[in-house]
């Protein structure tokens, strides 16, 4: 069969790469894709917003399955449109995707259905929000209600930071309509976990856990980004804790969305904090995380097409996972997540080892050269028997990649590796 992946980033490159391994798949198309994906897919110059063209392309090219990568087309109703046209598609409807599209709606669902999360209030008035922050005190978390490409969250450690964030969102329109309403929530302490699942109605098939690194710079410094690296598994969490998160959060959320008449089909992503009181939800996404996908899908031994098709056919597929660890580091353009230039030359990728995974997010071919064409540009990952080995291998490979315009964090996975070392010493 032919499959179509909608999107253009590193996540979509990974999904296309996984589809290309399936014996069922003849051709993988990605719309619009990027030039770095041509190893596994044919890129099609159609915007992810152009529903008419995408539908026409799917019909003309006998696409047997379409997979929607990013959140923006999901919230624009691309899945509803494909279904109306009789095309098989994997992703949530517009109504179901609101679990990501509106943080206040997600919070309301959690409150109604007793899904563990931090306490919160919603504001549209700057003065009321400011008064609330001053009454509650810091640290406190301020979030734009709508989509802000992973950058609409501020963990304010001082009153000044909190008020500046509220001013940005409610007065300065920093995120446009997405920030016209803000969610102010309790600051949760603990270890973070990204837990994703294949979902169809009440059927929830969890994946292995991952942890991403949101801050731009080493030591978790700097502004929030879409994610600067990730690893899987997450040794800080036991199998019992992962099972608890599935039973107390993922399954009840799928059931809650059924109750809300917003039945969810697709990838449900829970960003969790493992607190002293157990797992609590920080956020939901209605799609694969980026960069978590780039370290989770390489561990999936099962055929991705079989998993999705059996789920859509009402079955419960069993997933087979590789025990090995995967650690990936994002190379981003200097200036990201703020303003940055494009067009920096990238060299050295051809010198990387054959088993090194390279997923392209923002690259472009100009004549014979590969150049930067986005904020997050590449993710380089390695698979090894331990996180420590995977980390050492990745950073050795990154020494071969040359570009004047790129930076990356030097500490992806370090905290987990250090904690692992301490726990194994105490076990001896």
UniProtKB/Swiss-Prot annotation:
Protein's recorded name: Phosphoribosylamine--glycine ligase
Annotated binding of Mg(2+), by residue: 283, 285
Enzyme class, UniProt record, top EC level: ligase
Family annotation (SUPFAM superfamilies): Glutathione synthetase ATP-binding domain-like, PreATP-grasp domain, Rudiment single hybrid motif
The protein's required cofactors: Mg(2+); Mn(2+)
Co-factor remark: Binds 1 Mg(2+) or Mn(2+) ion per subunit.
Gene3D superfamilies: 3.40.50.20, ATP-grasp fold, A domain, ATP-grasp fold, B domain, Phosphoribosylglycinamide synthetase, C-terminal domain
Transmembrane regions: none
Taxonomic path: Bacteria, Bacillati, Bacillota, Bacilli, Bacillales
Coiled coil: none
